[in-house]
């Protein structure tokens, strides 16, 4: 047994537990125990002193990120996947692991039924090829097609659909166990039945690309909607006379709030305010598109042109479409804006696990894990935040 000292655990903003800890490691390098420093000395129950593996000097430890909204990368768009893309998909998953991401919910934006089902079949095959050191494919995130036309953003109008059980079955029949989330507009006629069916299937339902007002959002939350997709974007804004879905979600306190922390989708001030208003609800997502991992410039997105500049993706008409930034870049930016490192890390590494019921807290996410699979976060004297493999 070895022990690492002076380690910090990320926690939500305002959580008083973010102080320095011991980490106990097995001979194989797995974390076997975590305890606050000062509560016990550096010895085991027989009084034998544990070998000291060194001090981390207040650095943070975390699992790798979980990205619940990522649309592709390295030139692959998940809704366009075909069987011959499998090798490139595995390459992308390896790339994501090297970018600090443990698992993703591959996001399938609004598209035709046949391409959607074809993409889910490719993802099913890829899941069987998972191995250590490769980003894991969770269930898919279906973002559409049951979206409000007035809030569709970059989603193609021709593939939007009215919600119904028949339309749902046509799209997901046979793949029900391989879907983690679905984003929809709950105010649409027929959405209530779809929400109920998704909940029966243990699929998390998110409100997004929606024109719902606060009262409509409240009804949706009562019916089981548990998340907002890219908060602030493609929904009514947060206003002092019209709180909208975001205001209602913050009031309740139990709705996850997906946040794109690139500084373009949401102004840094609003991102920090959201974190302060709803510290345990904020979940950092990338919303990365197919050009993630590629250079800025002109790229293709289905039949459209995607213009990428400094990590921001727009259609030719200027419509904001997504980013090409890694998820953990959002951690660095939110930490810089807020001057709160631990909460920013928590929002990308622990909070997403709660949404899809992988684990409920930081210690649960760390105990039993190989140190080499985890991340160590260091803030230098200039305030810059960096991460590296923990071992």
Give the positions of each predicted feature.
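N-terminal metal-binding scaffold of metallo-dependent hydrolase/deaminase domains
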Residues: 1-46, 387-391
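Residue-level marker for buried hydrophobic side chains located in beta-strands
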Residues: 3, 64-66, 206, 227, ...
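Divalent metal-coordination and catalytic microenvironments
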Residues: 7, 29, 58, 69, ...
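Active-site-adjacent C-terminal substructures of enzyme catalytic domains
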Residues: 216-343, 348, 355-359, 378-383, ...
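Charged helix-capping and loop-helix junction motifs
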Residues: 87, 119-124, 164-166, 241-246
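Divalent metal-binding pocket/active-site signature
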Residues: 142, 148-167, 171-244
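Divalent metal-dependent hydrolysis catalytic cores, especially in the metallo-beta-lactamase
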Residues: 71-74, 79, 90-119, 135-148, ...
């Amino acid at each position: 047994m070895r022990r690492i000292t002076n380690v910090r655990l990320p926690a939500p903003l305002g959580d008083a537990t973010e102080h320095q800890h011991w980490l106990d490691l097995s001979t194989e390098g797995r974390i076997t125990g975590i305890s606050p420093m000062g509560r016990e000395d550096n010895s085991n129950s027989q009084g034998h002193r544990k070998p000291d593996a060194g001090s981390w000097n207040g650095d943070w430890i975390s699992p790798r990120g979980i990205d619940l909204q990522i649309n592709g990368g390295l030139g692959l768009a998940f809704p366009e996947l075909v069987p011959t893309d499998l090798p490139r998909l595995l390459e992308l998953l390896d790339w994501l692991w090297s970018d600090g991401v443990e698992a993703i919910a591959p996001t399938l934006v609004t598209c035709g039924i046949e391409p959607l089902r074809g993409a889910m079949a490719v993802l099913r095959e890829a899941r069987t090829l998972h191995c250590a050191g490769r980003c894991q494919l969770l269930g898919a995130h279906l973002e559409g097609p049951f979206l409000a036309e007035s809030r569709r953003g970059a989603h193609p109008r021709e593939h939007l659909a009215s919600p119904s059980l028949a339309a749902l079955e046509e799209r997901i029949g046979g793949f029900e166990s391989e879907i983690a989330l679905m984003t929809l507009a709950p105010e649409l006629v027929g959405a209530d039945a779809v929400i109920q069916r998704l909940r029966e299937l243990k699929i998390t339902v998110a409100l997004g690309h929606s024109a719902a007002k606060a009262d409509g959002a409240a009804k949706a939350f009562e019916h089981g909607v548990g998340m907002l997709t890219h908060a602030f974007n493609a929904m009514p804004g947060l206003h002092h006379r019209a709180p909208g879905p975001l205001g209602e979600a913050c009031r309740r306190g139990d709705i996850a709030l997906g946040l794109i922390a690139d500084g373009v989708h949401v102004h840094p001030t609003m991102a920090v305010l959201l974190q302060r208003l709803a510290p345990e609800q904020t979940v950092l997502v990338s919303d990365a598109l197919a050009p993630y991992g590629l250079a800025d410039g002109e790229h293709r997105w289905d039949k459209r042109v995607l213009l990428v500049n400094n990590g921001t993706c727009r259609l030719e008409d200027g419509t904001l479409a997504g980013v090409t930034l890694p998820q953990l870049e959002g951690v660095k930016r939110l930490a810089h804006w807020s001057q709160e490192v631990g909460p920013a890390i928590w929002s990308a590494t622990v909070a997403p696990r709660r949404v899809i019921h992988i684990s409920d807290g930081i210690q649960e996410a760390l105990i039993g894990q190989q140190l080499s699979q985890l991340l160590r976060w260091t803030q230098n004297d200039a305030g810059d935040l960096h991460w590296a493999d923990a071992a």
